[in-house]
């Protein structure tokens, strides 16, 4: 008689979960085996397995149609199959699972064969010279001694080395972050993550790995977390200039938001109140327009360069961006400066070879000096003046748009915001609008934000007024989609579009395009690039507030109407169990 612990999880509702559980229980008991089944469904986890039960088990059987974390079963043989096979071929599934109990050294397995535990790790310390690499070596040696597969990304003073790929992260069972600096963990959404200090990994890698298995935390799986995971997956697949540009934009955004809203607040006291020196409006204008807005382009350039060359790119990028401001080259000059500084710094970093004893001079002396000099001279003598002329011409054209041309531009920008919901096309429209804020051109920003809000809002409204066209899971997600839409997070529409792209995507594109066109036609202006409905409460953040809200409402209603027209009603039985 063998002791079996099992987990069942159907991808659609509770039916498959319970059918598989009952089939396994009945068949195992008929064969004289002990079995305990943990059931996963949309309603939560039923009858969770206890540590003592897992420890006493001879084998673990996972019948699931979605990913189930199996790190807690690391010391046991684990057999995986689908819920459908567990229902239709129960005896064969049990026989194949029990065949694993004869292994001398039980390892995590799948129904395609054995495999060791897969770990990905990041190590980083403030100085980045010694402890980063010592921690990486310690984790590698300890994992190898246990027969585990491990990949370690080091984030040192000369940038990231052995960067983890999206495929490595996707395949990993466990993530370990040993760092004394901030490490972005958004790309590990849905994974079991354990964080510790770099010193702990150096002094006790074995303890760190043991603690990671026992204490690691899995990121959540509600709609908001799903959206975050999708965004992280998209970020992981970005490469080349597109990735570098979006990195710069993401770091620039807080400055644009803070600066724009402070400028708007200065107008509360009167449109020209800031002209009186020593007053609060003058101070707010100095902070927002005089400081925050002046830093926008340098930060954009600095972090484009940082994305390309890591830390060595930051100094020449920031200085190149400041030169772009001084040369009136604006955000276009900042983009050029960022890419120039990044590639120059990366080339110097790779080309300059020093003895190990002098390696510490590269990040603090040699690279900043040479990369800044080269970038600065090219900006001053080659790039600055032509780019400034291009920016001036583009700004004059946009500010002189007639109503018809403004509507066309709004249609294009609005549609782009909904095409891929946070993807490259969406980000191209958004980056274009944000960049124009530095030239005091605010209409495209208003159109872009309004158009980015309507996809999740339209879907959320549709789940309320046309419940027979959505599953229970989708109807439940509608509330979260509404919050994401109000917050200007277009990605809230992705889970709906992924399930029914042929009907959802055309509906949201039309709704967003109409919203963008209305916003431009009605002369709406927006000085802040983010915030959704929450920024509308700030006086003077939006010009023509009532008409702007009307644009969003109309686009939302159009989206909802098209969804109702295109989506067919779902049978009642399927709506109830999905």
Swiss-Prot record:
Q: Which InterPro entries match?
A: Bacterial_PTS_Sugar_Transport, PTS_EIIB-like_sf, PTS_EIIB_2, PTS_EIIB_2/3, PTS_EIIC, PTS_EIIC_2, PTS_IIB_fruc, PTS_IIC_fruc
Q: Which reaction does it catalyse?
A: D-fructose(out) + N(pros)-phospho-L-histidyl-[protein] = D-fructose 1-phosphate(in) + L-histidyl-[protein]
Induction remark: By fructose.
Kindly indicate where the leader peptide sits in this chain. none
The kind of enzyme this is, by top-level EC class, is transferase
SUPFAM superfamilies, per the entry: PTS system IIB component-like
Q: Where in the cell is it found?
A: Cell inner membrane
- Residues forming the catalytic site: 125 (phosphocysteine intermediate)
Any idea which GO molecular function terms this record carries?
carbohydrate:proton symporter activity; kinase activity; protein-N(PI)-phosphohistidine-fructose phosphotransferase system transporter activity; protein-phosphocysteine-D-fructose-phosphotransferase system transporter activity
Q: How does it sit in the membrane?
A: Multi-pass membrane protein
Q: According to the UniProt record, list the residues that bear Phosphocysteine.
A: 125
Q: Which Gene3D superfamilies match?
A: 3.40.50.2300
Keywords, ordered alphabetically: Cell inner membrane, Cell membrane, Kinase, Membrane, Phosphoprotein, Phosphotransferase system, Repeat, Sugar transport, Transferase, Transmembrane, Transmembrane helix, Transport
Q: Which domain of life is it from?
A: Bacteria
GO CC terms, sorted: plasma membrane
Question: Which Pfam families does this entry report, sorted A to Z?
Answer: PTS_EIIC (PF02378), PTS_IIB (PF02302)
Some GO term, biological process aspect, for this entry: which one?
A: phosphoenolpyruvate-dependent sugar phosphotransferase system
Membrane-spanning residues: 251-271, 284-304, 319-339, 364-384, 405-425, 428-450, 477-497, 518-538, 545-565
According to its UniProt record, the EC number is 2.7.1.202
Please list the residue ranges annotated as the PTS EIIC type-2 domain.
241-576
Grouped into one coarse class, the protein's main location is: membrane
KW Cell inner membrane (keyword) present: yes
Question: What PANTHER family does its record include?
Answer: FRUCTOSE-LIKE PERMEASE, FRUCTOSE-LIKE PTS SYSTEM EIIBC COMPONENT-RELATED
Write the protein's name: PTS system fructose-specific EIIB'BC component
Q: Which organism is it from?
A: Rhodobacter capsulatus (Rhodopseudomonas capsulata)
């Amino acid at each position: 008689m063998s002791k079996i612990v099992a987990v069942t999880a159907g991808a659609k509702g509770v039916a498959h979960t319970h059918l598989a559980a009952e089939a396994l229980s009945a068949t195992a008991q008929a064969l004289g085996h002990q079995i305990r089944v943990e059931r996963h469904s949309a309603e939560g986890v039923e009858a969770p397995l206890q540590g003592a039960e897992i420890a006493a088990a001879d084998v673990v059987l996972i019948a699931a149609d979605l990913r189930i974390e199996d790190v807690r079963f690391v010391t046991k043989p684990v057999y995986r199959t689908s819920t459908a096979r567990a229902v239709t071929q129960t005896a064969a599934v049990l026989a194949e699972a029990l065949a694993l109990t004869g292994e001398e050294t039980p390892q995590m397995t799948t129904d395609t064969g054995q495999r060791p535990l897969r770990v990905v790790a990041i190590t980083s310390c403030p100085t980045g010279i010694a402890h980063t690499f010592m921690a990486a070596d310690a984790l590698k040696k300890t994992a190898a001694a246990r027969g585990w597969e491990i990949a370690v990304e080091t984030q040192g003073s000369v940038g990231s080395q052995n960067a983890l790929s999206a495929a490595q992260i996707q395949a990993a069972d466990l993530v370990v972050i040993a760092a004394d600096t901030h490490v972005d963990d958004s790309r590990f959404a849905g994974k079991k993550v354990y964080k510790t200090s770099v010193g702990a990994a150096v002094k006790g890698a074995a303890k760190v790995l043991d603690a990671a298995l026992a204490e690691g935390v899995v990121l959540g799986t509600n709609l908001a977390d799903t959206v975050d995971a999708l965004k992280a997956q998209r970020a992981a697949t970005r490469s080349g200039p597109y990735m570098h540009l979006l990195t710069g934009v993401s770091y620039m955004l807080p400055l644009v938001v803070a600066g724009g809203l402070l400028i708007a607040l200065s107008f509360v006291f009167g449109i020209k109140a800031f002209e009186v020196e020593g007053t609060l409006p003058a101070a707010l204008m100095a902070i927002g327009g005089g400081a925050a807005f002046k830093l926008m382009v340098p930060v954009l350039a600095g972090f484009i360069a940082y994305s390309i060359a890591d830390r060595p790119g930051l100094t020449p990028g920031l200085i190149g961006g400041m030169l772009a401001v001084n040369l009136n080259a604006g955000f276009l000059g900042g983009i050029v400066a960022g890419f120039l500084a990044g590639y120059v710094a990366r080339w110097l970093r790779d080309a300059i070879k020093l003895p190990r004893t002098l390696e510490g001079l590269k990040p603090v002396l040699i690279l900043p000096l040479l990369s800044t000099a080269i970038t600065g001279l090219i900006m001053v003598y080659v790039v600055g003046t032509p780019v400034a002329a291009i920016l001036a011409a583009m700004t004059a054209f946009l500010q002189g748009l007639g109503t018809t041309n403004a509507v066309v531009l709004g249609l294009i920008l609005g549609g782009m915001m909904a095409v891929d919901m946070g993807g490259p096309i969406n980000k191209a429209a958004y980056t274009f609008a944000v960049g124009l804020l530095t030239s005091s051109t605010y209409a495209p920003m208003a159109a872009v934000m309004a158009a980015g809000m309507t996809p999740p809002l339209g879907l959320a409204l549709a789940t309320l007024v046309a419940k027979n066209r959505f599953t229970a899971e989708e109807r439940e997600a509608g509330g979260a989609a509404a919050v994401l839409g109000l917050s200007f997070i277009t990605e809230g529409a992705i889970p709906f579009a992924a399930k029914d792209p042929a009907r959802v995507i055309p509906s949201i594109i039309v709704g967003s395009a109409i919203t963008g066109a209305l916003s431009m036609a009605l002369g709406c202006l927006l000085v802040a690039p983010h915030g959704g409905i929450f920024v509308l409460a700030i006086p003077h953040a939006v010009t023509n507030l009532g008409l702007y809200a009307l644009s969003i409402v109309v686009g939302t209603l159009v989206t909802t109407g098209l969804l109702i027209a295109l989506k067919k009603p779902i049978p009642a039985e399927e709506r109830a169990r999905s």
